[in-house]
Regions:
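Active-site phosphate/pyrophosphate-binding segments
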Residues: 3-13, 20-32, 37-40, 158-261, ...
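Catalytic cores of large soluble enzymes that bind and process phosphate-bearing ligands
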Residues: 3-6, 10, 49, 53, ...
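A residue-level signal for conserved active-site and pocket-lining positions in enzyme catalytic cores
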Residues: 18, 153, 318
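Glycine-rich phosphate-binding loops that contact phosphosugars or nucleotide phosphates
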Residues: 37-180, 200, 269-293
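A generic structural motif
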Residues: 71-74, 233-244, 293-302
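C-terminal active-site/capping subdomain that shapes the small-molecule cofactor and substrate pocket
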Residues: 249-334
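Short, small/acidic-rich helices and loops at N termini and domain boundaries
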Residues: 331-347
């Protein structure tokens, strides 16, 4: 199976994409940025491959930000949104229905809008509301444009003084992504490539991806979406500690089936709470006999953002190799476009 949209090339360009998007956001005149002293809360508005940039920033900087941050994936903004709200709206295409609806809702309530897109309707909505628009580096599929959206979010928060560590974290992340690309790029064959080897081990089993804490939860969900969209295969995700209060009860009832079908993938990072590390070990003892195999991916790099993006990047590469080894083209997402066309026909 060929890569008809050169999706692997887009994946390989992530480190440079992150740098270019940072430069674009850094060039915005400081006077155009919202004033930090006027902000009491932050909302991240976005869906899919664009919206997850908000999840990334929330997970990476929630411990540093002096105001609460909420990620929204719906049609309207909640009642607390108002003039003291910093509303980031992310849509790579600029035309995502739900993001446009939430942005209009936030604008109606007087929120301070910062939109990030390649133009489109979102740019017009933001500017009409007196907000700021930051242009993304063009030419990527939205799910391969995570750097084009994460970097402006981090850069704006840094320049506003809300996330003083964000600029250094971006640099650390870019360094680690380049290092990971050297390990996982298409020129590295066989078991020497950790993403190819992981895809080989997964084979045609169904991935069950577990992470720990905020970083692990976002990474696990991104992996799930990567397998869904790139490999066109089912996958499921959950996170510690929540899964130990519900999902753990599901294992064993159909153990003979899950032992054939499910591969548990543990996403580990250096910022796990000590109790979460114990939960990984204790829960694995229960689940191990109920799944085909247990695999682990360890985050590398410095800083919360760097380790989160590193885990996500491993998911990008692994899902693409999983697609190709199963004769699936990783680029096209026909089901999503068919649904969008159907929705456009409805009132």
């Amino acid at each position: 199976m060929t890569d008809s949209l050169n999706f692997l090339d887009a994946v390989a360009g992530l480190p440079e994409q992150l740098a270019a998007a940072h430069e674009a956001a850094a060039s915005v005149h400081r006077d155009a940025l919202p004033k930090a002293e006027s902000i009491r809360n932050i909302v991240m508005l976005g869906m899919g491959g664009s919206g997850i940039s908000g999840d990334v920033v929330a997970a990476a900087f929630n411990d540093e930000l002096p105001v609460p941050i909420t990620v929204l994936k719906q049609m309207r903004t909640p009642a607390f949104v108002g003039p003291d709200t910093l509303a980031f709206a992310m849509s790579y295409s600029g035309g995502t229905e739900e993001t446009l609806s939430m942005t209009r809702s936030a604008a109606e309530k007087g929120a301070q809008i910062v939109a990030i897109s390649c133009g489109g309707e979102l740019e017009r909505v933001a500017l009409d509301a007196g907000g700021l628009h930051i242009a993304c580096p063009p030419g990527f599929l939205p799910r391969a444009a995570i750097g084009a959206l994460v970097a402006p979010l981090c850069t704006v928060l840094y320049r506003m003084g809300l996330a003083p560590g964000a600029q250094a974290m971006l640099m650390y992340a870019q360094t680690q992504l380049a290092r990971r690309r050297d390990q996982c790029g298409v020129r590295v064959e066989g078991a020497a490539n950790p993403a190819r080897e992981l895809a080989r081990q997964i084979g045609r089993t169904i991935p069950l991806i577990y992470g720990g804490g905020a970083i692990g939860a976002v990474a696990a969900y991104r992996w799930k979406c990567d397998v869904n969209e790139n490999a066109k295969a089912p996958a499921f995700s959950h996170s510690y500690p929540e899964l130990d209060h519900n999902e753990i009860c599901a294992w064993g009832q159909h153990g003979d089936v899950t032992r054939q079908l499910m591969t548990l993938i543990e996403l580990r990072h250096g910022f796990e709470h000590a109790r979460l590390r114990l939960r990984f070990d204790a829960t694995r003892e229960i689940i191990d006999e109920c799944v085909h195999q247990v695999l682990a991916v360890e985050a590398e790099g410095e800083g919360r953002l760097g380790q989160l993006l590193d885990l996500m990047y491993m998911g990008d590469w692994t899902s693409c190799y999983l697609a190709l080894q199963n004769d699936v083209d990783p680029g096209p997402i026909d089901a999503i476009f068919a649904l969008k066309a159907r929705m456009a026909e409805l009132p």
